[in-house]
Structure formats: structure tokens, C-alpha cells
From Swiss-Prot:
Protein name: Uncharacterized Rab geranylgeranyltransferase C15C4.03
Gene source species: Schizosaccharomyces pombe (strain 972 / ATCC 24843)
Disulfide bonds: none
Coiled coil: none
Keyword Cytoplasm listed: yes
A cellular component annotation (GO) from this entry: cytosol
GO molecular function ontology, one term from the record: GDP-dissociation inhibitor activity
Key words, A-Z: Cytoplasm, Nucleus
Similarity remark: Belongs to the Rab GDI family.
One Pfam short name: GDI
Length: 459
């Protein structure tokens, strides 16, 4: 008889990489135990309710705020600081329909992750909605539309015919980037700043250059390497039009958290065992000792990845729960985009002549599932080497003015310092999970594949 406390693999932490790995191992008929000391899924990829936030606010009065994500010392948490302010408790929504994401991200419609969600039918556990890059405030303090497609370029009345031709030449280059001649050019420039590439190779400058670097690439500084930027722009253009007039998808109720739960649910369907809120005393190479004294063993133990070993940049992020009518923030050319999720970008020096980094704003309305009707959620982020409080306050004023609503009120404010991976999508996380899967089981095993189709009974 099998030992009930013995497994093929024990996974500690339910971040997205581990959740994907958990599903893949369970699909490969491995006996998997998945543990998380937190009471919620996702770790840094997860989300909190306002009730969770109130509990954490009490916890960080007693411990270092960077320790709110339990990690058992098994890895270095990417979350370095977490501060909560309830600015008007009387206006906090009474229902449970508000979430805060530790690290909100979108999914490119053309990404490998979306393909995997489709092939495995795990998308059935998610409610996916579109999101768009919307507006950018240039360094000349002019609001412009981010060019998401060729049609946007042709219809841009602020671009001369000569400028449109230059932009189209750049878009053609990106579309044919796999050509040998173009690859040689990319190799020459891959580690050099992207803005120099745009200026010297394509003679692009000014507002259109800013819209590419800070709009399409969501870069926080102008020094993004050329290869990273081109990879992002290529995904953006490939994604636009795949499912509609947008490039991004998000999952309702918190993208990262819902992705983690979707893969964990798939793992559980295939026999994986889960333990949330489970305190761990000690982790060895082949066993885990819980706080209650029980011991669990496995051929392989996987803990959350040490983010410090991966390329990252330290950022400041501010979460704001706002009460009021923010619909104009989702409006385009007089028509409501009906997305309730948009991205607004601030170029360097657009907020203040003393501030040389970009600020990125992700805005979610009630249609995203992240907040109730009559509220919206704003996420602002910039590099950590900035005077963040002043900059975020100025950006908030710009958004309030742009919203066209005179009676917006900020209810909750959360400030974070965290290490963010340099890429803005989830495919690197998928690659990491796949690499670890083959490291554990070998190259002869198939990753998230099995005979036959995914049956309705599996749900």
C-alpha cells in the first residue's frame, strides 16, 4: 500500500510557474502535493480582497511588510515593501467585489500562454476580456492615441504623409523581422538602447517614438534594449486583431490569480492534492516538516523561484480604489470602448520637467470584475529610483482631470516596492515551468498533453 505522506513531487508555493508545473506533472500521472503557506493562490501573482487587505494591514503593524507573502525562507520574495492606507472607510464597498493584484499584467492574445490555455481547455476556468493601450501623454504634454494598427497610422491627422511612410516602414520591418537581413540588423543593435535604434535606423522621433517605447513596449525608461523592445512590439502587432481590435487579454477577478487557480484546478482534476494556509517548519531535499510535526516526503521538492536570480528591475507601484464615474477613461473618440480596462502611459517629463522616467497606468472598471459598479481601480508604476510619492500624486491629478469627473474620491491606497521581471507578458513564466518539467521527468515526456480530448466530465 502506498504511503499517504509520500509523493512523486511536492511543490511549495502557488505562483504561476508552480501552478503550470503542477498541472503538467499531474497530467503526466505524477503524484503531486501542492502546498502554500498563504491562504490564497498565486503568491506574487495573486490577488487580495479588501477583507484580506484589512487583515494584512494589521499584520504589517507587527512584522516587516516584505514578509506578508509567506515564503518559509525558501526563496526571496520579490515583494520588498507593502503599505496600506484606508483613506475613507465609510465609502468602502460593502460587497466582496474588489480585489487588489500584487502585480497586474495582461496576456498578449498571440502569446504561447493563450495557445496553451486553448489546447488544454483550461481557458474554460477563466473569463477573459480585452484590454487596450489607450492614450499616451507626450513629453510636450499632449494626449495622443497609441498606434495599435496600420489603420491608426493612416487615420492619424497629426502625422505628415512623410512621417506615416517612416512609421509604416518600421512596421513592415517588424512584420518581416525573421528575414536574414533584418536579423543581422537586430543582432547589431540587440543590446543597444531602442530609442537610438528608432532614431538612427528609422529616423523616428518625438511623439511617435514615445508612443512606441512607452505605449507599445510599456517601458519605464528610454533605455530598454532593442531586442526586448522589438520582441514586445512584434507580439503586440501579431496580437492585434486576433480576437478583435485589441492586443491584450485579461482574466476577470485578477489575471494572475485566476491563471494560477485555473492551472491548479486542472492539476486537482488530474489527481493533484492541495493544501493552502499550511504552515511549514522545515524543507529538506526530499522531505517537508509541517508546523504540526507531520512529515511529507517526495522524490523531488520544488519551491518558488528565487526572483533575485532572474533579470529584473525594481519598481514602485501604487494601487488606488477610486469611487466615481471614470467611464471617460475607457472612452475613445466619443464612443465607449466597452472594455472597462485600458492602459494609459506617461512619457518621461510629461508629468514634471524634473521626472525623467515613464509612469504606466492600468485602469480597471467594474466590467473587469475587479471592483463593483461605481468604482474603478488604478495601478500606477514607475522605476524605484524616482521621487515616487510626488510623481504618483501628479499622475493621479492628470488621470482625474482626464476622467472628466469632478467628484472622484480615493478610498484605498496601497504602495509597493517589488522586483519586476523585465518582460511584460507571461511567456517567460511558461518557459520556466516547461524547463523545470523536463528537468524533473526528462525530454521524452509530453508537457500538458494526453491522449484524447479534454472531456466535459473533467470539469
Amino acid at each position: 500500500m502506498d504511503d499517504p505522506n509520500s509523493y512523486d513531487v511536492i511543490i511549495v508555493g502557488t505562483n504561476l510557474r508552480n501552478s503550470i508545473l503542477s498541472a503538467a506533472l499531474s497530467w503526466a500521472n505524477q503524484r503531486v502535493l501542492h502546498i502554500d503557506e498563504n491562504s490564497f493562490y498565486g503568491e506574487i501573482d495573486g490577488s487580495l480582497t479588501l477583507r484580506d487587505l484589512e487583515q494584512i494591514n494589521e499584520k504589517i503593524k507587527k512584522v516587516d511588510s516584505s514578509q506578508i507573502l509567506n515564503d518559509n525562507g525558501s526563496h526571496k520574495s520579490p515583494l520588498k515593501r507593502f503599505e496600506v492606507q484606508f483613506l475613507n472607510k465609510d465609502l468602502i464597498p460593502k460587497n466582496k467585489g474588489s480585489v487588489i493584484q500584487f502585480h497586474p499584467q495582461e496576456i498578449f492574445a498571440s502569446s504561447e500562454l493563450v495557445k496553451l490555455l486553448s489546447e488544454t481547455k483550461i481557458y474554460k476556468y477563466l473569463l477573459l476580456k480585452p484590454a487596450r493601450s489607450f492614450r499616451l501623454l507626450t513629453s510636450n504634454e499632449e494626449w495622443i492615441k497609441v498606434p495599435e494598427s496600420r489603420a491608426d497610422i493612416f487615420n492619424n491627422k497629426n502625422l505628415s504623409l512623410a512621417s506615416k511612410r517612416i512609421v509604416m516602414r518600421f512596421m513592415k520591418f517588424v512584420s518581416n523581422i525573421a528575414d536574414e537581413q533584418n536579423q543581422n540588423l537586430v543582432k547589431e543593435w540587440e543590446s543597444k538602447p531602442f530609442y537610438k535604434f528608432l532614431e538612427e535606423v528609422f529616423q523616428l522621433s518625438g511623439a511617435i517614438e514615445e508612443s512606441i517605447i512607452y505605449g507599445l513596449c510599456q517601458s519605464l525608461s528610454k533605455d530598454i534594449p532593442t531586442k526586448d523592445a522589438l520582441d514586445t512590439v512584434l507580439k503586440y502587432f501579431h496580437s492585434f486583431g486576433m480576437y478583435g481590435d485589441y492586443s491584450y487579454l485579461l482574466a476577470m477577478y485578477g489575471t494572475g490569480s485566476e491563471l494560477c487557480q485555473g492551472f491548479c484546478r486542472s492539476s486537482a482534476v488530474m489527481g493533484g492534492t492541495f493544501m493552502l494556509g499550511q504552515a511549514i517548519d522545515k524543507i529538506d531535499e526530499s522531505k517537508i516538516v509541517l508546523k504540526d510535526g507531520s512529515t511529507l516526503s517526495a522524490k523531488k521538492i520544488v519551491s518558488s523561484v528565487d526572483e533575485g536570480k532572474l533579470p529584473h528591475q525594481q519598481i514602485q507601484q501604487r494601487y488606488l480604489l477610486v469611487k466615481g464615474d471614470c467611464q471617460q477613461l475607457f472612452q475613445e473618440d466619443g464612443f465607449f470602448a466597452a472594455l472597462d480596462a485600458s492602459l494609459i502611459h506617461f512619457s518621461p517629463f510629461s508629468i514634471s520637467e524634473n521626472f525623467g522616467n515613464s509612469v504606466q497606468a492600468k485602469l480597471y472598471g467594474s466590467g473587469s470584475g475587479d471592483c463593483p459598479e461605481g468604482y474603478c481601480i488604478w495601478y500606477l508604476k514607475t522605476l524605484n529610483d524616482s521621487p515616487c510619492n510626488e510623481v504618483f500624486n501628479l499622475a493621479t491629478k492628470k488621470l482625474c482631470s482626464f476622467s472628466g469627473c469632478d467628484d472622484l474620491e480615493i478610498i484605498v491606497q496601497v504602495d509597493e516596492t517589488l522586483n519586476q521581471l523585465r518582460h511584460i507578458d507571461y511567456d517567460d513564466t511558461l518557459h520556466s515551468a516547461k524547463s523545470l518539467f523536463y528537468e524533473i521527468l526528462g525530454q521524452n515526456n509530453t508537457f500538458l498533453q494526453r491522449e484524447g480530448l479534454f472531456d466535459e466530465d473533467d470539469e
